[in-house]
């Protein structure tokens, strides 16, 4: 790709460089889902990124699957996120909020009235969540009915309104990593026989209904979407990822959204776990009217600079944890500070804001 450190415009929003900070769950919010002042410091420290995508943020209590993850579904959340956004903007940074519903990747402990988590179909994930006691197996989910699906679409709309009230520059719809939208998309987890199951068009309906509604709140160019076509994270897969995600990319492109964020390979793991033509996906998105392509997973400066011109933006995740000045380090070829995995989730400033 052309110079990683040049500015890049997504319509009327100009990123000062093409380095994007990936959304990273750090489990440092309050137990009620409110972001903290420490989180504001953390994001401000990383404001030299062209765009920060803030950590996955649940749109409802039902959407939560891990302890101390933030929410965006009440006025306390909005007020606390506003402080975070203000800190990033004070350093001339841009920040996007990733909207999240975990679906079946949850436990009754997190759910309203200790009820079962929800999913397109009642299939339990062979995956883990964590609370104050440590890691737990996910609970058996129940299948959503169509009225409940409409309610969740409406919750995404409210979350988008709340993000706008908190002054986020963009929002990203999290349709990857085996969470609720991904559970609808992929045929291993979606066994429905109604309007939301069966064909690729039906399995994509939930995502596209969400996109169609949130682009009434934010301009389409200020909305991104994250997918992970061949990731098996959270016990998920599809029998024909090429056909499914080409359709998804084209439909998102037709809606002229700001970017398509693609996790290449297995989330946080092997970039080459399964053969897949990502360049074709980026082309399909942009030829249909999408604005920018964003690649993610295991990128280094060398891999980024060698990337094809179909890729506009590169997302870096873990390196940003221990290198708040990652952009400068990449630009001037300075050594990167290694991260301490024991501090990735939970805790206070150690391993969070003290790098």
Where are the predicted features?
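Flavin-dependent oxidoreductase catalytic cores
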Residues: 1-355
